[in-house]
């Protein structure tokens, strides 16, 4: 059976079998488990964590929300802290880490071994350097529109290189999807004109006119 959208959280028997099979074939150090707290309510994690622990994972990453809670509800750091005290392996926290303040709150409230950043990195690709500066006790450098322009240029070229068959119009459409996240906080004119670009030349001209 294939379990979609964290559906395995509803069947501890299926989870137990899958984790056991993975543990049997993965070499030491390679077995990481990532999960949410449960499907409906956070207290389901009390039953889920012992199943995970029984297979001696090398690390566990916890998105501290349930499936039903999606991505918009508050996170539950107390469950990550509980897991860190129960497991013998490193526990990594995930969920709503969008800037230095939320990262510091996670460290203070849950004391995880590490942090996993997902969607926030699409909106703010500089978050990693910002967190590094904050945890080193240094102020983060202020971002400029030129930083964003440099990022767009690199993203365009890198994603183009990854395509086996480059089609300009399709690539521009793909870039628009990426920049839906990054465009937040930029002038409204950027989003307005960027979405109307049809060619690579027009796309880059719009970016340069507004951001340079």
Where are these regions (language model features)?
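Conserved beta-alpha-beta core of the PfkB/ribokinase-like small-molecule kinase fold
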Residues: 6-8, 15-23, 33-36, 40
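Active-site beta-loop-alpha junctions enriched in small/polar residues
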Residues: 34-40, 65-67, 96-98, 120
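Short, small-residue-biased leader/transition segments that mark boundaries at the very start
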Residues: 2-3
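Residue-level preference for long, well-ordered alpha-helices that form the structural scaffold
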Residues: 11, 41, 72, 141-144, ...
